[in-house]
């Protein structure tokens, strides 16, 4: 494993640990998800350039488009939650409440 791939896998693991241990605000969870998607995008783009295959050349762009959709949906849920509950605390969000 090269130094650069180790760096991106460490960034992914830090985002994953931040997502599992930081359970107070919805915004911090969304930022951890975005960091994970960014590290996956860069690692996938580097993998495609190292292998020099045309078969997977569109995979990083597809991942980037899906992460942009995820970011837009997450921000809209954040705004809806902040308007409905007054804060973005994850403890206040319970799917069993009306």
From Swiss-Prot:
Gene for this chain: MT-ND4L
GO cellular component: mitochondrial membrane; respiratory chain complex I
Organism the protein comes from: Polypterus ornatipinnis (Ornate bichir)
Membrane topology category: Multi-pass membrane protein
Record-given protein name: NADH-ubiquinone oxidoreductase chain 4L
Compartment(s) where it occurs, according to its Swiss-Prot or TrEMBL record: Mitochondrion membrane
InterPro entries xref list: NADH_UbQ_OxRdtase_chain4L/K, NUOK/Mnh_C1-like
EC number(s) recorded for this UniProt protein: 7.1.1.2
UniProt keyword terms in alphabetical order: Electron transport, Membrane, Mitochondrion, NAD, Respiratory chain, Translocase, Transmembrane, Transmembrane helix, Transport, Ubiquinone
